[in-house]
């Protein structure tokens, strides 16, 4: 698994990892593309997911309970064209990519971009702290279910 929800690496680093996986005869790549601290895949119907959710102001350093932050902006996301390129690159190496889009929890980045998606419908910032966040999609709202379907339609 590569956790780019928290730490965006970029296309060239992913390709290096896929090359190493192929060398080791590994055939499944679990790609963690969203989490509380970052949204890394373009969803054309919801551009704020990457505009807001693809960037955080700082990153917690040390263990999960640390109050030390690096003070550096961390950002990045993949366009749909880049995702297709990486999927093709993996397929040529007999590697299947399994993308992960977090839900119903670990949704802080989406809720920072679109507050109406959350259970509390309040404005939040993309978290800089790791560990448990308490923001989840309001799956009782049909509009949120439609959002999830829209996202999955573009991912699949």
Regions found by a protein language model. Name each.
Residues 24-29, 83-104, 135-156:
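An active-site-proximal structural segment forming one wall of the substrate-binding cleft
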Residues 7-8, 29, 77, 130, ...:
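Phenylalanine-focused residue identity feature
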Residues 1-13, 134-143:
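Active-site mouth loops of central-metabolism enzymes
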Residues 9-14, 77-82, 146-150:
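Short, glycine/acidic-rich beta->alpha junctions
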Residues 6, 33-37, 45, 101-107, ...:
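Active-site-proximal loop/turn and secondary-structure-junction residues that shape catalytic pockets
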Residues 37-92, 109-142:
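Aromatic- and acidic-residue-enriched carbohydrate-binding clefts of CAZyme catalytic domains
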Residues 3-36:
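A conserved hydrophobic secondary-structure block that centers on an alpha-helix together
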Residues 31-32, 50, 54-57, 98-100:
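Non-cysteine beta-strand/loop elements that form the S-adenosyl-L-methionine
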């Amino acid at each position: 698994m590569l956790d780019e929800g928290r730490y965006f690496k970029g296309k060239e680093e992913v390709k290096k990892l896929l090359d190493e996986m192929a060398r080791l005869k590994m055939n499944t790549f679990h790609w963690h593309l969203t989490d509380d601290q970052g949204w890394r895949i373009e969803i054309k119907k919801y551009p704020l997911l990457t505009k807001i959710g693809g960037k955080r102001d700082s990153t917690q350093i040390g263990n999960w309970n640390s109050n030390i932050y690096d003070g550096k902006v961390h950002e990045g996301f993949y366009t749909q064209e880049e995702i297709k390129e990486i999927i093709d690159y993996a397929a040529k190496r007999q590697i299947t990519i399994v993308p992960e889009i977090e839900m119903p929890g670990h949704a802080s980045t989406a809720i920072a971009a679109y507050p109406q998606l959350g259970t509390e419908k309040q404005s939040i910032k993309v978290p800089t702290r790791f560990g448990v966040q308490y923001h989840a999609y309001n799956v009782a709202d049909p509009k949120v279910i439609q959002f999830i379907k829209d996202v999955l339609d573009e991912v699949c």
